[in-house]
Every structure is written in C-alpha cells, then in structure tokens.
UniProtKB/Swiss-Prot annotation:
Protein name listed in UniProt: Ribonuclease HIII
Function: Endonuclease that specifically degrades the RNA of RNA-DNA hybrids.
Catalytic reaction(s) noted: Endonucleolytic cleavage to 5'-phosphomonoester
Assigned protein family: Belongs to the RNase HII family. RnhC subfamily.
Localization per record: Cytoplasm
The organism of origin for this protein: Streptococcus agalactiae serotype III (strain NEM316)
Length: 297
C-alpha cells in the first residue's frame, strides 16, 4: 500500500475538508479530525496538520494538493524489448464511458515517441492529448475498447455480471488478446496496476479469451514504459471524445470526475429527462446518482 505524508497549513486543511466532504468516512482515532476515502485511497487529516494518503492512488490524489512526486523516467533499461502496455481512463468519472487501450511498442519506436513528448497522460493538457493521440493511433499498433455508459450499466452493478474491478480485468484482457491475435510478439506485457496481481488472476479465470504470456501489473507504469504511456494518451482521448458526444446527446456539458459538479449536472438531467438520461451518459452505481436524487428533494 502506498503511503504519502504531507504537512497541511490551515488553507489546505480547509480545502481538503471541502473537496472531500462527499467522501467523508468515520474514524475513531481521537487525533484524526477529518477522514475520507476516494478511489481506493484513504485520506487522514490529523490535529497536528499532518495529512496522510494511503492506497493505490495515493500519489495521484496527493499531487492535487501540492505533493510533488519524483517521477521515474521511461528509461531504456526497462523497455529495450518489444512491449505491450495497457491503461484505462474513465473509471473514476461518473459521466462518460470506460476506455481501455493496449499498445505494442518496440525500441525502434522510442525516438519518435520521445520526439512527440509522450509521457504520463495525467501530466498533459487535454489539448495536448488531442494533438498527440491521432499521431499515435497511426504510428503504433494498438487496440482501443470503449465501454459506453449504457453498456456499462448493463454489466456492472449489484445484480450484474461485473463489479468495477472485474470489468476492467475483462477489458484489459480483451485488448491484449486482440493484439496478440494480430500476430504481435511482445517480450513483456505490462498493465498499469489498478488491483493486485492475485485479484487480477482470480477475475481472469472467468474470461473466455485466454493466452499463455505472463502479465505484469506495475504501479505508475505509464512513467516507466512508453507502451503504457501511449495507451494512456489514446485512452484519454477516446474518453474525452465520448464525453463530448454524450454532452451533445443530452444537451448539457458533462464534467469529468465524480465531484459535486457531477451531482449538480446529474440532478438537472434527472429533473429534465428522468433516470433514462443518466442511464445513457453516467455510471449509475456511483454514489453521485443518489446524491443527485437528493438534490431534487
């Protein structure tokens, strides 16, 4: 489990309380004045001002509050072989689909990718993503899958086949499988870790399409492998395109993420068109659905 510790001044403490109010959880530690859980990460604020992030997305969330991470570069030592790398975008957003991409990158691609400025898509602006992604789609063999919100709601949820993790396992597995079916021969397959290897393998047993190659799940893989960085950028662009299309469909600007703005837009859609509008453009099992309904009472 990743753990990041920071010191928060009064301004940052107030921001944490405001931003994460909807994710508040109880905590019996008398020295903890605020606690929340978001995207698999627990956030603890202590009376001393100490701010602790614990969980798989600790670094990503902490960076929103001033944490500066020492990034690992995409060094040639870790990727001087043909690699398939995968990443997903949209799993933390209430509106929009879930995009998963697998890309096949060889050492001969490295110079071109570095020239384009390929890196962790989370550090790139949406405008830069939109510029780079079409070039990558033409130059790099890849498979891109998009699970629309409507289809997502049919397969993910309490009474459906998948949960939020198993559906990602299915999509990552399928994207890799399709690349392998096209004859590409990686010496390594890397997934930007969203769960433990044990958990991944347990869910993988339920998948029809299997392959023999070993899979490696690594945290922050988009910073280590150009193949994962490519997938991250293409997936981000695919997600943004889908979000824009859905916005046009419903006539409202749909925000990315799962914050209070998503609650407000969802409540407006509910009032105007009913639950069917959210079935079309949002992931219904998110807590935002109930929060949006509460705003109408």
């Amino acid at each position: 489990m990743n753990t990041i510790v920071m010191q928060a001044d009064k301004k940052l403490q107030e921001k944490i309380r405001t931003d994460l109010a909807q994710h508040h959880i109880s905590n019996n530690n008398p020295y903890v004045v605020f606690s929340a859980k978001i995207s698999g990460t627990t956030v603890l604020l202590y009376t001393s001002g100490k701010l602790v992030f614990q969980g798989s997305n600790a670094s990503h969330i902490a960076q929103k509050y001033g944490y500066i991470e020492q990034k690992e570069s995409c060094s040639s030592e870790t990727q001087d072989i043909p690699i398939i790398g995968t990443d997903e975008v949209g799993n933390g957003s209430y509106f929009g689909g879930l995009a998963v991409v697998a890309s096949f990158v060889t050492p001969k691609d490295h110079a071109y990718l570095k020239k384009l400025g390929v890196g962790d898509s989370k550090t790139l602006t949406d405008q830069k993503i939109k510029q780079i992604a079409p070039l990558l789609e033409k130059a790099i063999p890849h498979k891109a899958l998009l699970l629309s919100p409507q289809k997502y709601n049919q397969v993910v949820g309490p009474n459906n086949k998948h949960n939020a993790v198993s559906v990602k396992v299915a999509l990552h597995n399928q994207a890799i499988f399709l690349l392998l079916q096209d004859g590409f021969e990686p010496e390594k397959i890397v997934i930007d870790a969203f769960t433990s290897s044990k958990n991944y393998q347990n869910y993988l047993k339920n998948e029809k399409n299997q392959f023999k190659q070993t899979i490696t799940l690594e945290e922050k893989a988009e910073n280590k492998y150009l193949a994962v960085a490519v997938s991250s950028i293409i997936a981000r662009n695919l997600f943004l395109e889908n979000l824009n299309k859905l916005s046009d469909d419903v006539g409202y600007k749909l925000p990315s993420g799962a914050g209070h703005q998503s609650d407000k837009v969802a409540s407006q859609l509910l009032k105007a068109y009913g639950i069917s509008s959210l079935e079309h453009c949002a992931k219904l099992h998110f807590a935002n659905t109930k929060k949006a309904q509460a705003l109408l009472k």
